């Protein structure tokens, strides 16, 4: 099986799409030209989706329910942000945010000696978004992600099953059946920003 991922340490490349599709992607996900690199977008998952918890959960649900070996980029399990003002691709390669303490508990070195500076903005900074604080919250993104991973691990069909895409009349809904032997799981994803009817 192939590895599948939502984001990684490189830019989201748009070199294989049409100019119109690239313009749409820039308008939706990289209005600030600083977020663009070459023909791509250099953002982590959470800021790419404007920190919208529902959209982040949807993307992870897709990642963990579709065929392939899912790969989470470090920090995406907690909704870690980026620093697009660092050069090249370094904005998505900042230190892991373990705690809200010194250097996010990534290192005991002086902050200026770190290879990359920690994210320090109020929305995604290590004081606001870190593993330690999310471990204590049952409804945190980290806890939600761990539960979803457990569902995937305990449901064999997600790891090895076939997939059959359904064609609901409502095009805002992506539905498919994962099957392995007698085991079948119906997966229904609402791709819109509002509640949707599905048959």
Stretches found by the model and what they are:
Residues 1-199:
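Active-site and adjacent substrate-binding regions of carbohydrate-active enzymes
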């Amino acid at each position: 099986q192939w590895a599948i991922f939502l984001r990684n340490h490189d830019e989201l490349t748009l070199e294989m799409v049409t100019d119109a599709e690239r313009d749409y992607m820039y308008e939706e996900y990289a209005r600030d030209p600083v977020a663009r690199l070459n023909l791509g977008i250099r953002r982590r998952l959470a800021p790419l989706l404007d920190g919208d918890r529902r959209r982040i959960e949807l993307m992870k649900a897709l990642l963990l329910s579709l065929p392939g070996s899912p790969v989470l980029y470090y920090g995406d399990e907690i909704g870690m942000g980026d620093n697009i003002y660092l050069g090249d691709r370094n904005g998505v390669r900042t230190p892991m945010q373990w705690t809200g303490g010194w250097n996010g508990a990534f290192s005991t070195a002086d902050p200026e000696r770190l290879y990359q500076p920690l994210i320090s903005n109020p929305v995604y900074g290590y004081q606001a978004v870190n593993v330690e604080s999310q471990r204590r919250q049952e409804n945190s993104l980290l806890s939600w992600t761990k539960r979803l991973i457990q569902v995937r691990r305990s449901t064999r069909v997600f790891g090895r099953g076939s997939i059959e895409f359904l064609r609901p009349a409502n095009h805002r809904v992506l539905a498919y059946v994962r099957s392995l032997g007698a085991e079948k799981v119906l997966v229904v994803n609402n791709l819109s920003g509002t509640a949707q009817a599905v048959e």
